[in-house]
């Protein structure tokens, strides 16, 4: 039993990974878990410089670094990926996780287009930039790799609000499916994780800041009872997709949502 535990903890042994949006929430949980599972190096890429450096230092500077990076700026992403590959001798896993969510209702009739552009810039353009540049580096290195995007449960259905966010996440699924087909010849796998909302800095804009908020507003729509959603659960899914355990998995969206897709989800009408 002990041997199995040790093996599981080393599922990412020797791998070099990048986690965008890694300074908080799901990204932070993933960076910590990747190191726990034996990753040789994890680079946190985020615009939150002070917080990102603090997280990297708490994980350990010998295994974790921080690079300030705006994921929608292609030159910054390209530079960050080049620095990672040069510093650590490769790139095995890219987790495109950075995202934003407006506090406005953003219904179709009242869609604020400047806010819409902000969401699409980070969630859709940012994901495309990260996938593109990671793919280029992985093809150049010639040893395959795993690219993971954070799509979300909003990526496969509509909603009564946050139209811009829903649209941005639908686009991520299209990106994952297309990239998986195009990059398979290079032994590069492309998948996504789709969490239900957990209490992270992102969800605060929608009034979900604590586990109690999750319990009140979201759990009624989840079929699995007694298991509150956490960032660590999503991190485990990302670790699986980044590891050799998922060696024959590509083009897949892995829901981490407690069965929310099995039930009506009418946000705002409860």
UniProtKB/Swiss-Prot annotation:
Cite the effect that the entry attributes to residue 150 to T. No effect on catalytic activity
Against InterPro entries, the record matches this protein to: NAD(P)-bd_dom_sf, SDR_fam
The answer to whether the entry has keyword Magnesium is no
Q: Is Isomerase a UniProt keyword of this protein? A: yes
Q: What is the effect of changing residue 169 to M?
A: Abolishes catalytic activity
- Impact of changing residue 154 to L on the protein? Abolishes catalytic activity
Q: What class of enzyme is it?
A: isomerase
The protein's annotated catalytic reaction(s) are: (S)-8-oxocitronellyl enol = cis-cis-nepetalactol
An annotated Gene Ontology molecular function: isomerase activity
Q: Which SMART domains does this entry report, sorted A to Z?
A: PKS_KR (SM00822)
The EC number(s) given in the record are: 5.5.1.35
Q: Which residues bind NAD(+)?
A: 21-27, 46-48, 70-71, 97, 165-169, 198-202
Q: Give the coiled coil ranges.
A: none
List the keywords (alphabetical): Isomerase, NAD
SUBUNIT field: Forms homotetramers.
Function, in words:
Functions as a non-oxidoreductive cyclase to promote the formation of cis-cis-nepetalactol. Cis-cis-nepetalactol is then oxidized by NEPS1 into cis-cis-nepetalactone, which belongs to a family of metabolites that are both insect-repellent and have euphoric effect in cats. Binds NAD(+) as classical short-chain dehydrogenase/reductase (SDR), but does not utilize it for its redox-neutral cyclase activity.
What family does the Swiss-Prot or TrEMBL record give for this protein? Belongs to the short-chain dehydrogenases/reductases (SDR) family.
Its recorded name reads (+)-cis,cis-nepetalactol synthase NEPS3
Please name the source species.
Nepeta racemosa (Catmint)
């Amino acid at each position: 039993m002990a041997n199995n535990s040790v093996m599981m903890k080393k599922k990412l042994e020797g791998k070099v990974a990048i986690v965008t949006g890694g300074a908080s929430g799901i990204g932070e949980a993933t960076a910590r878990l990747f190191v726990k599972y034996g990753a040789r190096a994890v680079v946190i890429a985020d615009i939150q410089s002070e917080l990102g450096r603090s997280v990297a230092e708490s994980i350990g500077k010998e295994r974790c670094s921080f690079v300030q990076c705006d994921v929608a700026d292609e030159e910054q992403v390209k530079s960050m990926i080049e620095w990672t590959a040069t510093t650590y001798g490769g790139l095995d896993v890219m987790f495109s996780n950075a995202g934003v969510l407006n506090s406005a209702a953003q219904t179709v009739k009242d869609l604020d287009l400047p806010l819409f552009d902000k969401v699409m810039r980070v969630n859709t353009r940012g994901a495309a930039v990260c996938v593109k540049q990671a793919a280029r580096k992985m093809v150049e290195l010639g040893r395959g790799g795993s690219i993971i995007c954070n799509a979300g449960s909003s990526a496969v259905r509509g909603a009564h609000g946050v139209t811009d966010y829903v649209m941005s996440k639908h686009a991520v699924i299209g990106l994952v499916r297309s990239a998986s087909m195009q990059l398979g010849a290079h032994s590069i796998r492309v998948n996504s994780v789709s969490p239900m909302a957990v209490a992270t800095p992102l969800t605060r804009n929608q009034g979900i800041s604590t586990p109690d908020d999750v319990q009140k507003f979201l759990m009624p729509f989840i079929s699995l009872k007694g298991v509150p959603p956490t960032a660590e659960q999503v991190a485990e899914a990302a670790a699986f997709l980044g590891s050799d355990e998922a060696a024959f998995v590509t083009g897949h969206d892995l829901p981490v949502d407690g069965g929310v897709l099995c039930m009506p989800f009418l946000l705002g009408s409860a």
